Amino acid sequence: MKVKFKLFANFREAAKGKEVEITFAGSTVGDAIGALAAAFPAMKPLIYQDGRLKQYVNVLLNGQTVKGDQVASMPVNDGDEIALFPPVSGG
């Protein structure tokens, strides 16, 4: 299966690009993110803490928010788009 990642801020820097296509054998958003981290090892500490997705990582699947507890089980289809970005803050 192949998905496209749109990456923002420090995720973009770690993957050296704003868009990355990843081919992987899994079927969930979590599997896709794991494949991304395997392809770009610099991303792993930005995404995971103690083997779990960091709380602050925002995940969108085809423009829809995927909550942290749904990432591991949310199905993904060939050609889907996953966006990863850190929280936005301002003042």
Please provide the spans of the model-predicted regions.
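Ubiquitin-like/PB1-type beta-grasp interaction modules and other compact soluble beta-rich domains
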Residues: 1-90
